[in-house]
Amino acid sequence: MNKIYIILLTVFFYANVYSQQAYFVDGYHGGIYGHYPVKWKTQFIVDQLAMHPDWRICMEIEPETWDTVRVQTPEAYLRFKEMATSDQVEFTNPTYAQPYCYNISGESIIRQFQYGIAKINKHFPGVDFVTYSVEEPCFTSCLPQILKQFGFKYAVLKCPNTCWGGYTAAYGGELVNWVGPDGTAILTVPRYACEKLEPGSTWQTTAWGNSDAYLKDCRNAGIKHPVGMCFQDAGWKNGPWLGSGKNTKNNSIYMTWRDYIENVSIGKTDDNWYFSQEDIHVNLMWGSQVLQKIAQEVRVSENRIVMAEKMSVMAYLENKYICRQADMDEAWRTLMLAQHHDSWIVPYNGLHRKGTWADQIKRWTDSTNHLADGIIKASMRSLMKSLFRKIMLNSNIYVFLIH
């Protein structure tokens, strides 16, 4: 009799354990600069979405990519445009060039979102941006404030399949309130405290494939709605990452992050995580000469373009000078491209058969500097004209100190 009770208890235990539903967020990461085979990829995506109506994807594609897709594969572009606002698709990282964020200026991060959102909405007007989620460790402590200002409601601090550039500290359970240094909080799916690095690996966490071990750790940690994640490289020819239909691994349900957070997760939490820069465990080749050179080039351009904006504003206030918006936009565009995450992690890799990433960064920042210098000179000429007029009229003269 005791044996029967033991057997029944064992069966009940395992039935209860495996009855807990698992969820998974799939998607694509890349772009025209960071892997996106234009000739077939968009058609492949729309075909897979049509073939698997229960599949959901999050899109982290460089916004400029869609300019090329529209020209080279117009039919696939139009089909995806129809699907872009469906329940199957969520855009989760609209930044122009997917920067790491922790190694560039705050103003640059703001412009990455500003220009990226504008470009995506130009192609897909109905798309909104609710959840920030990335495949690379594109995080920084001040993001909650910036995300909230751009209308985001949620964030995700996982990057399970691409940790070679770094990963966030393991903390918390199903949800946390990510609190930035200014006190702004955003509801966030963290890299769970139980979400370990894969054995013998520093480039994957256990959340990348909803394995039995990962789901067991989640259950033991009290996570009611465990979720895994993998944004596939856009160069890979894979559809649903965990399989489809009855063959989906561990009966996982595909979700977008928005759908998961709003309709599946516990929805709110009292766990406030005061996330700092030290919680981003980065893994770049700091100290190498090429990375020092890239950092210097990017920082010079960041300072130069902000100086150009300040000068043009002063010239406008003094003399109604307006710089050419196309010049300012292009100056920001080339700087944003120089801030691409691949600039920092693979600087010696080739890019479009035009030398290495490091070579291209030099060209991009040189272009930004040239345009910014032109705006500064034009602003100074406008200010000088106003100064001479005031001298002739014996008016008050103001001295501008530029830092």
Predicted regions and their residues:
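Catalytic-domain carbohydrate-binding cleft regions of carbohydrate-active enzymes
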Residues: 20-403
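Bacterial Sec-dependent N-terminal signal peptides
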Residues: 1-20
